[in-house]
Each structure stands twice: as structure tokens, then as C-alpha cells.
Amino acid sequence: MAKKSLIAKNKRPAKFSTQAYTRCERCGRPHSVYRKFKLCRVCFRQLAHRGQIPGVTKASW
């Protein structure tokens, strides 16, 4: 989990557009965040396995 101060800092508008970065909506992780779902890969995988993300199925080929 991210520190509360970092989550609050991320909610404020960035001074410059290049300073803005995405965080996971669920846990606050700053790396490997899928923009479409606003979730990090770890949270995405957990929710997908539980079937809580509509339209997401496990790939098999």
C-alpha cells in the first residue's frame, strides 16, 4: 500500500504535465498501471481471477 501522503500528493494537479503519473485506484501502486482499468497488474490479476472485471477472460491458445 502507498503512503497516504503520496496518494494525496497524486490527487493534486501537477505543476507540469510531465510530472503527472498514474497510480492504482485500489492499492496506490505507481508502476505497471493499466490506464483502461486504472489498476496495477497485481490488482488486475486478482480481480480478473475472481470474475469481478466484466469482459475479461483468461487467454488460452
Swiss-Prot record:
It comes from the Bacteria. One of its GO terms (cellular component) is small ribosomal subunit. Gene3D superfamilies: 30s Ribosomal Protein S14, Chain N (4.10.830.10). One of its GO terms (biological process) is translation. Keywords: Metal-binding, Ribonucleoprotein, Ribosomal protein, RNA-binding, rRNA-binding, Zinc. Binds 1 zinc ion per subunit. Binds 16S rRNA, required for the assembly of 30S particles and may also be responsible for determining the conformation of the 16S rRNA at the A site. Its cofactor is Zn(2+). InterPro entries: Ribosomal_uS14, Ribosomal_uS14_bact, Ribosomal_uS14_CS, Ribosomal_uS14_sf. Part of the 30S ribosomal subunit. Contacts proteins S3 and S10. Belongs to the universal ribosomal protein uS14 family. Zinc-binding uS14 subfamily. This is Small ribosomal subunit protein uS14. Zn(2+) binds at residues 24, 27, 40, 43. One of its GO terms (molecular function) is zinc ion binding.
